[in-house]
């Protein structure tokens, strides 16, 4: 399941783009129950970094923990375990959000005329360009009509890809 690029991307976002998170997940999957201290030692990563990743995963409900109090020291020990059965639903939800955003962007591209400042590389709607007299508000340069056919084509490709994933990928077919 973790080999799926869409799942990897969502997990990467959840873990604030920290690649160590995948190592943490691997340790959790391979040991099934482990303390944050043991993960830190196994990966040779600072304990606070391991805890930060575990908390992010916990917020997404992808890990669970048990807390036990040491009666001698009064310290708590947290034992973490993976809870990856929620991954497909989480990825499907994020994919739907992305898909909706792409569809909104496609509608915007298809229903508007755009202008472009080649110096600043900024794209403006016709209304915004007209309001500024077809001069770039950043640099004052002339704006030129922008052909967004490639943008529309790219958006359609991305939408089709995600829709295909929903229908063809068995991980997401239930969502």
From Swiss-Prot:
The keyword DNA-binding applies. Transcription factor that plays a role in the activation of archaeal genes transcribed by RNA polymerase. Facilitates transcription initiation by enhancing TATA-box recognition by TATA-box-binding protein (Tbp), and transcription factor B (Tfb) and RNA polymerase recruitment. Not absolutely required for transcription in vitro, but particularly important in cases where Tbp or Tfb function is not optimal. It dynamically alters the nucleic acid-binding properties of RNA polymerases by stabilizing the initiation complex and destabilizing elongation complexes. This is Transcription factor E. The gene is tfe. Belongs to the TFE family. Keywords: DNA-binding, Transcription, Transcription regulation. The lineage of its organism: Archaea, Methanobacteriati, Methanobacteriota, Methanomada group, Methanococci. The winged helix domain is involved in binding to DNA in the preinitiation complex. Residues 3-88 form the HTH TFE/IIEalpha-type domain. It comes from Methanococcus maripaludis (strain C5 / ATCC BAA-1333). HAMAP family: TFE_arch (MF_01909). Monomer. Interaction with RNA polymerase subunits RpoF and RpoE is necessary for Tfe stimulatory transcription activity. Able to interact with Tbp and RNA polymerase in the absence of DNA promoter. Interacts both with the preinitiation and elongation complexes. Pfam families: TFIIE_alpha. Coiled coil: none annotated. GO terms for biological process: regulation of DNA-templated transcription; transcription initiation at RNA polymerase II promoter. The keyword Ribosomal protein does not apply.
């Amino acid at each position: 399941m973790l080999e799926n690029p869409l799942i990897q991307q969502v997990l990467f976002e959840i873990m604030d783009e920290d690649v160590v998170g995948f190592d943490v997940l691997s340790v959790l999957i391979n040991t099934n129950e482990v303390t944050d201290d043991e993960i830190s030692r196994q990966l040779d990563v600072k304990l606070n970094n391991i805890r930060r990743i575990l908390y992010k995963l916990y917020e997404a409900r992808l890990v669970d923990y048990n807390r036990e109090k040491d009666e001698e020291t009064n310290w708590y020990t947290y034992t973490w375990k993976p809870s990856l059965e929620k991954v497909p639903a989480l990825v499907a939800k994020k994919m739907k959000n992305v898909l909706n955003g792409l569809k909104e962007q496609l509608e915007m591209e298809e229903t508007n005329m755009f202008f472009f400042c080649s110096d600043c590389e900024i794209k403006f709607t016709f209304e915004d360009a007209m309001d500024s007299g077809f001069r770039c508000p950043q640099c004052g340069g002339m704006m030129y009509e922008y052909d967004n056919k490639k943008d529309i084509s790219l958006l359609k490709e991305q939408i089709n890809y995600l829709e295909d994933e929903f229908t063809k990928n068995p991980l997401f077919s239930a969502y």
